[in-house]
Amino acid sequence: MDALLVVNAGSSSLKFQVFGIVGMDLTRQIRGKVDGIGTRPRLQATAADGTQLIDQTYDAKAVRDLPAAITEARRWLLTLEGFELQAVGHRVVHGGPDYTRPVLIDATVLDHLAGYQDLAPLHQPNNLAPIRLAMEINPDVPQVACFDTAFHRGHAKHTDCYALPRSFYDEGVRRYGFHGLSYEYIAERLREVASRAAKGRVVVAHLGSGASMCGLRDGRSIESTMLHRPSTGCRWDTPGQLDPGVVLYLILQKGMKAQAVSDLLYHDAGLKGLSGLSNDMRDLLASDDPHAALSVAHFVYRCVLNGGMLAAALGGIDAFVFTAGVGENSPPIRARIVEGLAWLGAELDPAANEAGAALISTATSRVAVHVLPTDEELMIARHTLALISAPNA
């Protein structure tokens, strides 16, 4: 069977999926991941029917970094029979101002993408590592980069620029938006399950390991809460939209070096910094610590605030969509956010919400509230197949 491999690499985990190809149709064959890299490494994979294919732990020294994790995943994948690899699709967080759609990767493109590492220091180096390795090991297999920023590149210029001298915009200092692969999938999925709403004004809340929100009009991104780097918006693993005066205070008054400020913002901020406990929403909801309650209240407030901002950018709202880990699986968070958006006409059906229904608003709600699982990997696979199937590929 002809197959595609989809790779999503992070600092402490490596996710991969194998899709079978029949014509232009894709069928998911395998889901896998290596997590706990450098601490408690574990390789797991399941078949499409849920059958466990491997569950193996490693010594921390054996899988101490991402390249080692890639090597172990590749070693296992090579034991599989019946697949003919046609291409590899990669999630790349930052495409900068130049990449507005997926692209076949060559050495020039790879060098160009490496130049965006300062724009996404936690993500870009990890995204590019498996690409480099794949190009070395399988130079004849096409590698495709799919960007989290690309879906937002159609924003009007006045929404993406900062009030700085124009030269900074020309250098790439602008609002980009992220989680674009997720939003693109939701836009397509919404056309299937709620076609009327999909043509209107939709606010999507991607509440996963990172969090952001996006305003869609007729399936196109109009505005996003994430800005220049993937550390802004209603996030919980970083401080979100931080007043630049705070950064100046840390440098000028506290005497912190730039790297120390970066470490603070990327590693010690967000809900973990505010609560002193965890970035995991499940831990915070289960805790009776008042700081945990404060962190949850802060997060919900930021989501409600951003929901109102996006509704204003869209000129109103017809539907609201929850997606990603917390958005799909946390009824308490969904309930509190919808309650905060009641002034926009959103009315929650508590029973549907607790049951995890696809539609959790009442029949009389002016805003339809949906819960839709996202599928960034399928979006990457679709883009990859389309690109390698193009006449000039």
Swiss-Prot record:
How many cofactor units bind, and how?
Answer: Mg(2+). Can also accept Mn(2+).
- Positions binding substrate in this chain are R91
Record SUPFAM superfamilies: Actin-like ATPase domain
Q: Where in the cell is it found?
A: Cytoplasm
Q: Which keywords fit this entry according to its UniProt record?
A: ATP-binding, Cytoplasm, Kinase, Magnesium, Metal-binding, Nucleotide-binding, Transferase
> Would I find Phosphoprotein among this entry's keywords?
no
Enzyme class, UniProt record, top EC level: transferase
Annotated site residues (Transition state stabilizer) in this chain = H179
Does Kinase count among this protein's keywords?
yes
Instruction: Name the residues that bind ATP.
Output: K15, H206, L207, G208, S209, G210, D280, M281, R282, G325, V326, G327, E328, N329
List each coiled-coil range: none
Q: Which GO terms describe its molecular function?
A: acetate kinase activity; ATP binding; magnesium ion binding
* Main location, first listed in the record: cytoplasm
The Enzyme Commission number assigned here is: 2.7.2.1
Active site residues per record? D148 (proton donor/acceptor)
Q: Where does Mg(2+) bind?
A: N8, E376
Q: Quote the pathway field.
A: Metabolic intermediate biosynthesis; acetyl-CoA biosynthesis; acetyl-CoA from acetate: step 1/2
Cofactors: Mg(2+); Mn(2+)
Instruction: Provide the reaction this enzyme catalyses.
Output: acetate + ATP = acetyl phosphate + ADP
Gene Ontology, cellular component aspect: cytosol
User: Function, please?
Assistant: Catalyzes the formation of acetyl phosphate from acetate and ATP. Can also catalyze the reverse reaction.
Q: How does it assemble?
A: Homodimer.
Provide the family line. Answer: Belongs to the acetokinase family.
Q: What protein does this entry describe?
A: Acetate kinase
